[in-house]
Design a protein with these regions (language model features):
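Short, glycine-rich nucleotide/cofactor-binding loops
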Residues: 147-159
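Redox- and metal-dependent alpha/beta enzyme cores, enriched for Fe-S-associated oxidoreductases
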Residues: 158-183
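Electropositive, gly/pro-rich neighborhoods at or near active sites that engage anionic ligands
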Residues: 1-146
Length: 183
């Protein structure tokens, strides 16, 4: 039942136009409105749970870089840890898709945070923000940036808002762009 089996593929722009025509003709504002609302509610409940808050705030001494860490180095490391954990939550779709996520324990969240954080743009992203995860020789490298944040999926937006608040607390100016229609 794969759409490419019959060699019929509809370009995404055409598909979007056809959906818009259907919605305009049927006077349905958004057929997925209830599902989007449930995703946002699930994500908000997961983020607000004691288990999630506890895991986000848990810190081991070795996380700060050892016993000879400086205050500047510790602050830099804390920024890195907090942002990394929030970004990890932003890609954990189960938080807003599955009901089981409401029953995650602190250990479940800590296992999520222990996953390797990789990708082509990870180092460049943290460097752009001035968050290196370690103390730099020249002191703090945090220079406020202007960031365009694209928010496009219900559920995920709840985590995005927490990340945006963190970036604003760090002095960055964040402009949020939403896709057309309710998120």
């Amino acid at each position: 039942d794969h759409e490419t089996r019959d060699e019929i593929m509809v370009p995404s722009r055409l598909e979007k136009r056809l959906v818009n025509i259907f919605l305009n003709r049927t006077q349905i504002s958004d057929p997925y409105l209830c599902e989007k609302g449930m995703r946002n509610l699930r994500a908000a409940r997961s983020l607000g749970s004691a288990a999630c808050r506890g895991a986000l705030n848990r810190l081991a001494v070795q996380d700060l870089g050892g016993s000879r860490s400086t205050l500047a180095g510790a602050r830099e490391r804390l920024r890195f840890i907090e942002l990394k954990r929030l970004l990890t939550l932003a890609v954990e779709e189960a938080l807003w898709v599955e009901e089981d996520a409401l029953h995650y324990t602190e250990e479940n969240y800590l296992r999520l945070f222990d996953r390797p954080f990789t990708g082509d743009g990870v180092d460049a992203f943290f460097a752009f923000l001035g968050i290196q995860g370690r103390a730099s020789a020249d002191g703090p490298s945090l220079v406020p940036k202007k960031i365009l944040w694209l928010a496009d999926e219900s559920g995920e937006i709840m985590v995005d808002l927490v990340i945006i608040r963190l970036l604003a607390r760090l002095g960055h100016k964040v402009v949020v762009a939403f896709k057309d229609g309710p998120v």
